[in-house]
């Protein structure tokens, strides 16, 4: 199906809320076709900036269940007023989380997943200017009608969090020995063993480091996913070679007051994963859900830095 390069969209059609729309093709088809099922696309990656971006999406069917197979396509639009101009188009691939592939994995009862996700749709996109943008995602599944959904998002001029290639903040984060009860710095039940290392101390000791910013019990995103569980499951595979630190998002969850380290790292969403090399430089960062394969590949690359 051929789409015109410029698509007129009303302000309602690309509102700040997620769209539930039919196909955005202009023109009248030669023969009547059934209206595609009403679906929803949710951005898993919460931060997008001018330049190259990793974009992750969750596509929900008419019953609110994640769509996890098929051939995907994404079109990115720059929005100006009530019009949207096509800027790029790319394939979107479904990537399973694949926790079961890790030896010794067992599902943790404390994990709070807002959606029963087994993975996410992944692509890359380059944005040339800040401001409002939109994405239209289509998924073609064998034996099913084409599904199409749109949403809008903002592109920032620059990230508020540490950039890849920049020094990581030398944070003096709270650790287990600083508090009377581990629940002061972890909402995980039971808590793991990512609370014994200060970020500043790991960097000073030239230890590679994974820093996870997430809140297992108070996930505020619909697609925050099992990030804590993913990192905790991977940790034993690399614990000899690097340190793992979990930072809760909220100091005061009821009033949404963030932890000091969250503020120091400039984070405005969750979850986030940062990989810091032995020189204290940020090598990878992930906004939103990250798959096991992506995370392990990034860890291996970080450990290889001398």
Per-segment meaning from a language model:
Residues 213-216, 247-250, 287-289:
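Active-site-proximal beta-strand/loop segments in catalytic clefts of secreted hydrolases
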Residues 239, 245-270, 275-282, 292, ...:
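Thioredoxin-like thiol-disulfide oxidoreductase module
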């Amino acid at each position: 199906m051929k789409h015109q390069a410029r698509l007129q969209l009303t302000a309602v059609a690309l509102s700040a809320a997620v769209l539930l729309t039919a196909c955005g093709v202009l023109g009248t088809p030669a023969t009547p076709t059934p209206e595609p099922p009403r679906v929803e696309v949710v951005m898993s990656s919460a931060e997008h900036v001018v330049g190259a971006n990793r974009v992750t999406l969750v596509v929900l069917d008419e019953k609110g269940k994640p769509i996890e197979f098929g051939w995907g396509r994404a079109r990115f639009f720059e929005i100006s007023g009530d019009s949207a101009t096509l800027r790029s188009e790319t394939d979107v691939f479904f990537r399973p989380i694949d926790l079961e592939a890790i030896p010794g994995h067992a599902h943790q009862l404390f994990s709070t997943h807002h959606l029963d996700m087994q993975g996410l749709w992944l692509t890359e996109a380059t944005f040339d200017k800040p401001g409002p943008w939109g994405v239209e995602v289509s998924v073609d599944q064998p034996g099913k009608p084409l599904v199409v959904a749109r949403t809008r998002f903002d592109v920032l001029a620059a990230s508020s969090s540490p950039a890849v290639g920049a020094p990581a903040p030398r944070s003096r984060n709270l650790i287990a020995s600083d508090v009377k009860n581990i629940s002061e710095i972890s909402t995980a039940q039971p808590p793991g063993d990512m609370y014994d290392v200060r970020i500043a101390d790991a960097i000073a000791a030239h230890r590679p480091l994974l820093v996870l910013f997430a809140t297992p019990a108070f996930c505020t995103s619909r697609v925050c996913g099992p990030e804590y569980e993913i990192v905790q499951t991977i940790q034993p595979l690399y614990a000899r070679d690097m340190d793992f630190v979990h930072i809760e998002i909220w100091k005061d969850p009821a009033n949404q007051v963030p932890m000091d380290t969250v503020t120091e790292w400039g984070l405005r969403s969750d979850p986030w994963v940062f990989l810091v090399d032995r020189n204290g430089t940020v090598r990878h960062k992930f906004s939103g859900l990250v798959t096991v394969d992506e995370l392990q590949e990034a860890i291996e690359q970080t450990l290889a830095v001398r």
